[in-house]
Amino acid sequence: MNSKSNTQTCLPPPSTDLACNSTDAKESKAAIPPMLQVLLLEDNVELAELLRLMFEMWGFQPTVAHLGREASRLLEEQEFRLALVDIDLPDTTGFEVVAGALARGWLRNTKIIFFSGDPSDDRVAMARQFPGSIFVPKPFEMKNLMGLIQKLFPNEPTCEC
């Protein structure tokens, strides 16, 4: 999305006065929309950290899980608007995590992006069994991922870094 009206910059313009009194801080907090809660389920620690940093830079609030059981616990405790789910995990599959969460009534208002280094037809077909989910093959470009997320959440302010 190239519209500047729906975006926020990562850094304030050089002319911005960063000093504010408590009244200004209260007013500015009221104007800032809540951050998009994102679950990142990825067993590769380096990729998970990169995704976490990118999502923070984009203005989202990511929570990372490296195992399916960690993700299930997080899904029970809090709501997410977006879940990026690796399919191949050491303790289960991303499909099983999502199916279990949906069976418990979790993830009802969550957009799901499955990703895997194995983009076989079987994997894509399995991902399509979850209504509204998207399959993204690894490796992927971060800018393409951001573009996809902007399409999923057109009204969310995002960072164009």
Region spans (language model):
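Acidic, metal-coordinating helix/loop segments flanking the phosphotransfer/catalytic sites
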Residues: 64-82
